[in-house]
Regions:
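Walker A/P-loop nucleotide-binding motif
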Residues: 45-66
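A conserved segment at the C-terminal end of the G1
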Residues: 66-73
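Conserved nucleotide-sensing/catalytic segment adjacent to the nucleotide-binding pocket
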Residues: 75-125
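Short loop/turn elements that form and flank the Walker-type P-loop nucleotide-binding site
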Residues: 47-48, 103-106, 187-188
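Extended alpha-helical coiled-coil/bundle linker/stalk regions that scaffold oligomerization
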Residues: 181-431
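Interdomain "pre-motor" coupling segment immediately N-terminal to P-loop NTPase/helicase cores
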Residues: 1-10
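N-terminal pre-Walker A segment at the start of P-loop NTPase domains
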Residues: 10-46
Length: 447
């Protein structure tokens, strides 16, 4: 069946409902393709004769990147492409074809989800020498010490785990918004339906900037967001999953309400971390509540409190994106700029200061006892069994100086750091005075 080539509301609604690269025409794939540093990295690998293994989760964009490289002008004529090895039932057939391509020194890209790749390695690594390289690189994607990290610049195979890619960066978010509002056949000046209205709003620079800020904040969380999640979210914000634009739409079809009503990873993140009732600001909340009261204009405020509250929530959602137009004298980022700030600063800074280390030791010590003064050493606590029975009592007799610890930040292996942006989901406290390092992963919940 020939795919529908249209780029109108039907196409965007299909994106909102999960239709992606495998079922799109070439024109549609090109229209929504978000160019990132990964495009250039893949091009360089192919042009230098390497094979790339793209792995990760469903929706990470593996198939899309292969299809775009295939149609690229100047792509190697003899390149070997396998858009979805995960769908193959016979791994041996895949591996034999792959080995043949390697033996003939053909460049190429193979896409396979992370689970099937581990299964392939478990079952067949001993039978194919090149799978040793794949396994080593898969285990070395993230490193703590660049100086001692294994390098694979000279390998004929390059493994990229897109599970580590941050797709909520400003450049990617802006491209995604612009692709879905300017590269599609939806003209806000031709109709006044909900789709055209939402497209016009998302073409506004202030709205785009606030989307980028919120995405950037959400991108620092532990939850992995795929490129499919991002496009699905934005397409739903524009259409509500409807292919036909509804004239004179109600509030439920405004983009700032649709951002909270869809299904998927980004919608869950919005509901959990960008809840208007959780992100409070005394002056903003007061002014928006007063505005809600005026718009509802009840005779009895107490009787209309639920209606006023509903209107207030909608105004608060609108303010998150249209703060300048609403002219309250405050920026919407003042509502969420300090969410988990201390942990994010510890996790994302390139190098740990002595102050960071002391603060972290104080927090860990505080798990067992008052730690306001315990910043220069880590107390070691023990529990004992008496006559074979456990006791709830714990005691400390030893401590370790802070000079024996370092804070490490996970980073991409230097061999692939040019392929994508990575934001770690934790920091690491490392004991460095022993023959082998002992590490404690410091997650948001532990911190």
């Amino acid at each position: 069946m020939t795919p529908d080539n249209s780029l109108g509301p039907e196409f965007v609604a299909r994106l909102a409902n999960g239709g992606f690269a495998e079922t799109m025409s070439e024109d549609q794939r090109a229209a929504i393709h978000i160019r990132t540093q990964l495009d250039g990295f893949l091009k360089d690998c192919l042009d230098s004769g390497k094979q790339v293994v793209l792995t990760g989760n469903p929706g990470d964009g593996k198939t899309q990147y292969i299809l775009m490289q295939q149609r690229r002008h100047g792509a190697p004529d003899d390149a070997y492409y396998l858009p979805d090895a995960s769908a193959e039932s016979d791994y041996l057939k895949v591996l034999d074809e792959w080995k043949t391509a390697l033996d003939k020194e053909r460049p190429g890209i193979l896409a396979i989800n992370e689970g099937p790749l581990y299964e392939m390695l478990t079952q067949h690594q001993s039978d194919y020498d090149f799978l040793d390289t794949v396994a080593d690189q898969l285990d070395s994607q993230i490193v703590l010490n660049e100086a001692t990290a294994p390098r694979f610049d000279d390998d004929e195979i390059v493994v990229l785990n897109l599970n580590h890619r941050n797709v909520l960066s400003r450049p990617i978010a802006l491209q995604a918004i612009q692709k879905l509002t300017t590269e599609v056949d939806i003209n806000p000046d031709q109709d006044d339906g909900h789709i055209e209205s939402n497209v016009a709003k998302l073409q506004n620079e202030t709205v785009q900037e606030n989307f980028k800020r919120i995405f950037r904040m959400l991108g620092k969380l532990e939850t992995h967001v795929t490129i499919r999640d991002l496009l699905n979210f934005l397409a739903y914000c524009l259409t509500g999953g409807r292919a036909e634009s509804q004239s004179d739409p109600g509030e439920e079809l405004k983009y700032y309400n649709l951002a909270y009503t869809g299904r998927g990873t980004l919608f869950e993140l919005f509901r959990q971390y960008v809840d208007p009732e959780d992100l409070t600001h005394p002056f903003v909340d007061s002014m928006l509540w007063s505005r809600a009261e005026r718009e509802i204009a009840p005779r009895d405020v107490d009787d209309a409190r639920a209606e006023i509250r509903s209107q207030y929530v909608q105004l608060k959602r609108q303010f998150l994106f249209e703060d300048q137009a609403m002219d309250l004298g405050y920026s919407s980022k003042s509502l969420y700029y300090d969410v988990d700030y201390d942990f994010l600063e510890l996790r994302n800074e390139d190098s740990g200061t002595q102050e960071d280390l002391e603060n972290l030791l104080r927090r860990i010590n505080g798990y067992f006892a008052d730690s306001r003064k315990m910043t220069y050493e880590l107390q070691l606590w023990f529990s004992h069994k008496y006559i074979g029975r456990s006791t709830k009592a714990i005691l400390t007799r030893h401590s370790v100086s802070k000079s024996d610890f370092e804070i490490r930040r996970p980073k991409l292996n230097p061999s692939i750091e040019d392929a994508m942006e990575y934001i770690p989901d934790s920091a690491v406290l490392e004991y460095t005075a022993g023959e082998t390092p002992v590490r404690l992963e410091v997650t948001r919940s532990l911190y």
